[in-house]
Amino acid sequence: MAKKFNYKLPSMVALTLFGTAFTAHQANAAEQPQNQSNHKNVLDDQTALKQAEKAKSEVTQSTTNVSGTQTYQDPTQVQPKQDTQSTTYDASLDEMSTYNEISSNQKQQSLSTDDANQNQTNSVTKNQQEETNDLTQEDKTSTDTNQLQETQSVAKENEKDLGANANNEQQDKKMTASQPSENQAIETQTASNDNESQQKSQQVTSEQNETATPKVSNTNASGYNFDYDDEDDDSSTDHLEPISLNNVNATSKQTTSYKYKEPAQRVTTNTVKKETASNQATIDTKQFTPFSATAQPRTVYSVSSQKTSSLPKYTPKVNSSINNYIRKKNMKAPRIEEDYTSYFPKYGYRNGVGRPEGIVVHDTANDNSTIDGEIAFMKRNYTNAFVHAFVDGNRIIETAPTDYLSWGAGPYGNQRFINVEIVHTHDYDSFARSMNNYADYAATQLQYYNLKPDSAENDGRGTVWTHAAISNFLGGTDHADPHQYLRSHNYSYAELYDLIYEKYLIKTKQVAPWGTTSTKPSQPSKPSGGTNNKLTVSANRGVAQIKPTNNGLYTTVYDSKGHKTDQVQKTLSVTKTATLGNNKFYLVEDYNSGKKYGWVKQGDVVYNTAKAPVKVNQTYNVKAGSTLYTVPWGTPKQVASKVSGTGNQTFKATKQQQIDKATYLYGTVNGKSGWISKYYLTTASKPSNPTKPSTNNQLTVTNNSGVAQINAKNSGLYTTVYDTKGKTTNQIQRTLSVTKAATLGDKKFYLVGDYNTGTNYGWVKQDEVIYNTAKSPVKINQTYNVKPGVKLHTVPWGTYNQVAGTVSGKGDQTFKATKQQQIDKATYLYGTVNGKSGWISKYYLTAPSKVQALSTQSTPAPKQVKPSTQTVNQIAQVKANNSGIRASVYDKTAKSGTKYANRTFLINKQRTQGNNTYVLLQDGTSNTPLGWVNINDVTTQNIGKQTQSIGKYSVKPTNNGLYSIAWGTKNQQLLAPNTLANQAFNASKAVYVGKDLYLYGTVNNRTGWIAAKDLIQNSTDAQSTPYNYTFVINNSKSYFYMDPTKANRYSLKPYYEQTFTVIKQKNINGVKWYYGQLLDGKYVWIKSTDLVKEKIKYAYTGMTLNNAINIQSRLKYKPQVQNEPLKWSNANYSQIKNAMDTKRLANDSSLKYQFLRLDQPQYLSAQALNKLLKGKGVLENQGAAFSQAARKYGLNEIYLISHALVETGNGTSQLAKGGDVSKGKFTTKTGHKYHNVFGIGAFDNNALVDGIKYAKNAGWTSVSKAIIGGAKFIGNSYVKAGQNTLYKMRWNPANPGTHQYATDINWANVNAQVLKQFYDKIGEVGKYFEIPTYK
């Protein structure tokens, strides 16, 4: 969009740095504010994960029968008691769909049973208005209630005459009735057969006008009863037959006639019933649909009076005895159990969260395992592989939310599909059940995600895959399951797919469910009532208190009457809102336990909104006698305790939650915990009178496992914490390991050491380091892509002093990671790329893609990676305690590694076998391979290439000795240190081990390696080594030299704060010198102490941070934050503080770029800038123009480029490509072209014409002229206006609350991260920073 440039930086900056959706609201910002709601921000995707997962969790239970859907039996709907007026449980309520109740006119049928021994009286009573079901039984000889049994018989079709009734013969089958309990209906299906000696004939002679259909609670879409005990009785099915019960005292014939409105077809069925008691039955028919991701009326299957369906029967595509067995047994799928693990990672699929593209069939390949054993093993080894679900003959257990990918089918399959494992079974029936369960689960997932079944087995395209198909068509894995396992049971994937396909058609009501007869149903009548019964359900996150006068709690919102509750005047959580017609309800539950109580009418509660609780760590004062509650906004019925003591007591808060406009905190005071309103708390203040200095010198020491970087300004390292003065250290601004923390009186220390070798350096004061927590490293085996120019470090969270190397090459390079460690909230991976090894932040890594970029998210390990040998270039010291050495990585046992312990060896190969990674040790002198050792048994460093380095040195009096190998141990020492003092050393070659240089040469007639730091080079023989880096000159009072060994020198004052590009370095008498180019082109020598990696200035604001935050909080346009996707809300105090705290921001390697000075050119080369401009339309190869513009007008090159990329749509806009204006209209046909790459003068009402006019008047006849000329306008109008950093643009610390370019508190953070990404892309870093400081 073109911008109006009549104002200060408006929304241009808000859009300058890609991907931000933050609007400027201030008076001096854009005249046309942006519509925030229309922006899609990548930051919102992470917040949306919770919503996607929550939506998916609404449907987690499979139906209990083959034709059912994923009808969710949610605990939010308490089951009603079964009584003579039974209510119907509505499983759709929690699926947030609508429910339609349809009443139908039913034809009634009379069935009489010939039974000479039966003297019971059967009668039918129908209540046409209530449509309720009364089952009563009378038995004069027994007080027990008999159980109604219904016997279904298979109907035969007579096709001789479609216009007339057909006669069928049917045989009776003897049955035995059972009486398990009252008010239950057990139905028994009896097939028509010829295995009985007695045969009776029935003929349809009349049609009846009354229908008796028992009403059954807890029914699902296909009319089956829910089996809450998960018991599968194959001799009984859950269908209801339409029957009429007539009084019969003697042998008689019973006839039933069905009339359907289906053209030219009549189906007549005969049934035989045996009754054990006198019964009355009245029928209610309800219809509802399976769950769908889109809202639809629920009008599908009905619990009809007979096993009939208007849908056609499914015709199997393959002949399968097992599938026929499943159909014949009418197998039910069990409920889907959830066994999620909190520490499993959650990554979106390549199309986003909640968007899988299909499902993959796996088998566990383990004949001896169980489903519980498989899941337990997976949880222990989830870093190698984990899947979404396991299925066996009895259970379906979902182990990971299907809205997120899993690691089960290789990197390409993981990005796309749901992975489900079949656990091995061993008998025919169990195997059939497992196939039924898998097919039901697969069909449910396809239906849920609106995917149609399509086998990918033969063409690699579809929604149903085997692991073998993934291997064949996508790659990244070599597995071939589940074919071998299926064949072992005389089954095939084609049969399984056919079952999945049939299940899907049943669930989507395209074919008739199992156990039904295909026929046209009776026409439904209009709803009996005029009330709007549409149900809508939405998620809610509030709290409520039930009023003393209320209508009670409702089990379902369809209940006509609520039941009494003891939760009156208690604060309860509200999780859902439901509307049914004119009635509105809240679903309430216990705040702490989550126990569901039921639905309550909205008019019966006092309701308040509630934000999610957040963790805090704050201390307050609270008066004695104050009340603590078990819940926030608690009532007298929810008192936890009273604050004891007298006067103010210390309350330590750990949680905070906002209820409406009030804030409640949870914490502990005097050993008692609970919630209290912030109104009753005051901030703990320091004593007004100075206290006497503490004389407590008690020492406490604790173990620690963190990392730290020593600040440039420090008091040194302490040998013991009792030392009064520290020693100067060269370990500043390096990442060190922290192994212990100590407190001595009011002083606190960390014990720091080398991260890789474990060598302790000493104690450092805690306030003189930047400290981060660190988890233990874990072994991994993953492959990523990394851009050239990215730095590898010798340690995780490494600094510029710990660079191991730079990624070389063009385009994405393959990074093979073997270790992973979490530092604070960031993840670092150790691995190898192009022969170089080191640590890289996961931020710079992306998952490899096969053909196209699948996702910007890093997708970790495939299920099992094929072993491969990598070439590495490292050196290692074998630990004293090791697991031995192997001749081959395949050896199950290792030989003793004692003789290799505490020795240094070269490593040139690395291989992962199973869950272990091994390295090949090589003798450093003979280059002979020695054997493989586990990578955990060695300490490794990168080793450089040996180079010729001829020179003469003297060995320092204090040295470490001469060794047979660089970085050797005492076991490899050739000459002791005391024999080398002040001796001449003649060097012939050199090599770097990590950051340390070692020289190879001769001393005292012995030849070996010695550390360069132990040598003093003769001034006439100083040797230089290549070194490439750009420094900033930081000492205006020092000098540069044409020859560092001579006295001639020249002042650095004219070059102060300019960049100095180094090409080589050397040490002369212990002083490091750099040789490079000044900005005026001179090549000179400068001492390292006169240079800095980056120039940081601090600007004092004159106010406290709290004062600045209070000013921001009182603005008319409040600072904004997105706690939920696309929903802006006022940021709270802690959120604003977090965004404004310059100390915190400056310590973050990415966020500190909001302090980058945009008014300071960095003098980057045109070649480097062209890397950012590759493929950017007319801006491609314009690096020289941007470099010239930046230098000429004093602007940061990266900022200038990012500005142009946004305004030109990556160099593709017509305004950038150029044109002319003729007769007030834009044209490209005049032969003249004028370009505008910053949208200057391009007003919204006619942006193209106005922008070209401006360019024409300015004479911008080329893209380069437009860049240079436009930069002048940008510099003078915006950056030079005083707010020369992103932080200043957002918060304006010089005058808080005025002239701020955005209201979003994260605006500067996000833009800073984008700037950092640009620098990383070209392998550079920012050089000039200005950080405001508060009192």
Swiss-Prot record:
Classification via PROSITE patterns: GW
Catalytically driven reaction(s): Hydrolyzes the link between N-acetylmuramoyl residues and L-amino acid residues in certain cell-wall glycopeptides; an N(4)-(oligosaccharide-(1->3)-[oligosaccharide-(1->6)]-beta-D-Man-(1->4)-beta-D-GlcNAc-(1->4)-alpha-D-GlcNAc)-L-asparaginyl-[protein] + H2O = an oligosaccharide-(1->3)-[oligosaccharide-(1->6)]-beta-D-Man-(1->4)-D-GlcNAc + N(4)-(N-acetyl-beta-D-glucosaminyl)-L-asparaginyl-[protein]
Positions of region (N-acetylmuramoyl-L-alanine amidase): 303-863
InterPro entries per record: Amidase/PGRP_sf (IPR036505), Amidase_domain (IPR002502), GW_dom (IPR025987), GW_dom_sf (IPR038200), MGlyc_endo_b_GlcNAc-like_dom (IPR002901)
GO cellular component, one term: extracellular region
Region (Endo-beta-N-acetylglucosaminidase): 864-1335
Tagged with keyword Translocase: no
Domain GW: 533-610, 612-686, 700-774, 776-850, 868-943, 945-1020, 1023-1096
Subcellular location: Secreted
GO BP terms in the entry: cell wall organization; peptidoglycan catabolic process
PTM notes: Undergoes proteolytic processing to generate the two extracellular lytic enzymes, probably at the septal region on the cell surface.
UniProt feature, compositional bias: Low complexity: 515-531
The entry's keywords: Cell wall biogenesis/degradation, Hydrolase, Multifunctional enzyme, Repeat, Secreted, Signal
Main location group: secreted
Top EC category: hydrolase
Annotated spans, Disordered: 51-88, 100-262, 514-535
Secretion signal span: 1-29
CDD domains reported in the protein's UniProt record: PGRP
Polar residues composition-biased segments: 58-88, 100-127, 143-155, 176-223, 244-258
Enzyme nomenclature, EC number: 3.5.1.28, 3.2.1.96
Source species, domain of life: Bacteria
Function (record text): Endohydrolysis of the di-N-acetylchitobiosyl unit in high-mannose glycopeptides and glycoproteins containing the -[(Man)5(GlcNAc)2]-Asn structure. One N-acetyl-D-glucosamine residue remains attached to the protein; the rest of the oligosaccharide is released intact. Cleaves the peptidoglycan connecting the daughter cells at the end of the cell division cycle, resulting in the separation of the two newly divided cells. Acts as an autolysin in penicillin-induced lysis. As a bacterial surface-associated protein, mediates attachment to polystyrene surfaces, contributing to biofilm formation.
Record note on domains: The GW domains are responsible for directing the proteins to the septal region.
Homology family: In the N-terminal section; belongs to the N-acetylmuramoyl-L-alanine amidase 2 family.
Name recorded for this polypeptide: Bifunctional autolysin
Gene: atl
